[in-house]
Amino acid sequence: MNNQPIGVFDSGVGGLSVWREIVRQLPYESILYLADRAHVPYGNRSSREVLAYCDAICGLLIDQGCKAIVVACNTASAVALQALRDLHPSVPILGLEPAVKPAVSLSHTKVVGVMATPATFQGQLFRATVGRCATDVKVVEQVCLGLADWVESGASEEELETLLKGFLTPMLEAKADTIVLGCTHYPFVIDTIRRLAGKDLRVIDPAPAVAAHLAKVLGERGLTAGTKEPGQHRFLSTGDAASFNAACRRLLGLPVQCEEIRWSLGPEGRLSLGQPSPAPHQQKPPQAF
């Protein structure tokens, strides 16, 4: 048994879709969530930049006592997951694998659409997954530039529909009947996707599978929380705390008090993150999301 928190991070608020599912499946676990909003979205960054950011974030989460880390970002998982495991072997580090395998099993037309960032499609993880799981299925790769930004900002619904129609049309014209959400921001617009695409389209959110895998890993390693009290949750952001708090209210109905931390250039030009305050603001989860 281990009552230390789980670390969860993303470039912004997208990883809250994973955080939400972990809270649902593992209500007694505490979570330290970090949003690197100074660099959002990672999909627009180079692989070298993303690895540097993720390395520093994992270091901070481990320093804060996290017993496991979830890379709640498809781009970061595609680019940096194995390197992070090599750099930080003291804790289990989980990432997001594109949910191509379940999509293939569900598709009747044998055409699967994947919505993601360019970096996710270019990553070795995505290529390996497609090569392993989709040998007899057509995979339509749909780059969704601007969609993560919309989720971060909460711009107009009209703008969202314009974006989604442009992304969905090529996949639907290719006869895709199953779509994989390959970015953790996208589950926050899943209802609009379903409304625009029609009730027959299957849309796969990978967050439930990630939370289930986390539960399995914690159990196997004896890291499950030894309490029946609801977990305590803490939120950090490298960007403006007020805008993160507003995004949490908009996306989750959750009134949080986020702490701001700042990036700095350490010895030998190495990126580092300032330590958060020693008196954390911990919050209980809401009754419903």
Region roles according to the model:
Residues 1-289:
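Non-catalytic structural scaffold of enzyme domains
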